[in-house]
C-alpha cells in the first residue's frame, strides 16, 4: 500500500495550479484502489464567482478531482508516468450523482476503485465524502492516449 505526498503527485499528474485537485494520496493499492484527499480552501479561484456570498465548489470540479485520482491509480498500476508523448485523458462519466455541496474548510476524501481495463480504456467507480457524509459518486472512464499538440 502506497502513500503519495504532493511532490509525488506532481510526478504522476500533468495538472498544475489552479487545476491540480489532489493534495495527498493516503492509500494506493495498484490494480485495485486509491484514496486521496483534497483540502478545499476559501482561496480557491472558483469561489470568486461560484457563488459570491455562498461559495460552493462546482460539481464538475468534484468530478475532475475523481478523474485525477483515477489517473494516479492508472499510472501506479502500469508503473508509468505522464510524458510529453502520452497521458490519461478523462474519457467519460456515467451515473454521476451529487448529494450535498462542498465549501471552504471541507476536506474531500476521494475513493476510486478499478472496475476493468481493456487496452487503453480504464473504468472506475468513485465516491467523494466529507466528514463521512457522501458528497458525490460516479463511474469514471479514462483513456491512455498520445498527447495532442
Swiss-Prot record:
UniProt-annotated location(s): Cytoplasm
GO cellular component: cytoplasm; membrane
Active site: 50
Disulfide bonds: none
Keyword Lyase: yes
Example of a GO MF term: (3R)-hydroxyacyl-[acyl-carrier-protein] dehydratase activity
PANTHER family: 3-HYDROXYACYL-[ACYL-CARRIER-PROTEIN] DEHYDRATASE
Function of the molecule: Involved in unsaturated fatty acids biosynthesis. Catalyzes the dehydration of short chain beta-hydroxyacyl-ACPs and long chain saturated and unsaturated beta-hydroxyacyl-ACPs.
Protein name stated in the entry: 3-hydroxyacyl-[acyl-carrier-protein] dehydratase FabZ
Organism in which the protein naturally occurs: Nitrosococcus oceani (strain ATCC 19707 / BCRC 17464 / JCM 30415 / NCIMB 11848 / C-107)
Upper classification of the organism: Bacteria, Pseudomonadati, Pseudomonadota, Gammaproteobacteria, Chromatiales
